[in-house]
Amino acid sequence: MENKIQPTIYYCYDAYCGWCYGFSPVITRIAKEYEGRLAFDVLSGGMIMPEEPTHFAPMAQYIQNAYKRVEELTGIKFGQDFLWHVFHPEETDWYPDSTKPAIALCIMKEYYPEKAVYMASDLQYALNYEGRDLTDNEAYRHLVIQYQIPEEEFYTKLKSEEYKEKAYYEFALVKQLQVTGFPCVLLQVTDSKFYLLASGYTDYETLKARIDKVLSEINKDSTE
């Protein structure tokens, strides 16, 4: 018989995923509601991994229309400082890459693993509302201060190969879990048993109902 573990929600996301930004209020609400009953972890998916630095312009042209759909469906708002880059692709100096925000999250989770969902949400707010460049080391300083993480330690780790490898391990794990798009939410109940709870944006009521259904099934199995 397989080992029972504390049921764990894995939220697979990418810092640059606009739909994940729209999903942030849903997953943070779920994390708050199920605190103590479920464990939570966030895995970065490595959505943007250019072989060489690639300018934001092609992505910006897509976002010019797509962001409105995200706002309409989720109720989230993109900030003017972010949208400036979206609507001035010829002037922006952004070269998006998922690696650094993934490394930053790996470091932050090490200090406060129970806050992983909130940290991921804050990283996305920093980009999509405040318009911070997540490839710039300074984009993280306010979060390091907010979460009371030792600054020198954080920045040493941000430049280290060790934490880059941790981020790449998460990218590989997300692929191994057969995640093909973001956001994605999985619930692990045994060493090898996972339930897919969300693939793409999912509203709070739907996600909560799916979680409760799985938890009810687990409890039923354990009493039989």
Model-predicted segments: where are they?
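Residue-level recognition of the N-termini of beta-strands and the immediately preceding loop/turn
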Residues: 7, 38-40, 183
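C-terminal cap of thioredoxin/glutaredoxin-like
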Residues: 11-12, 16, 23-32, 122-224
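Structural alpha/beta surface segment adjacent to cysteine/selenocysteine redox centers
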Residues: 24-127
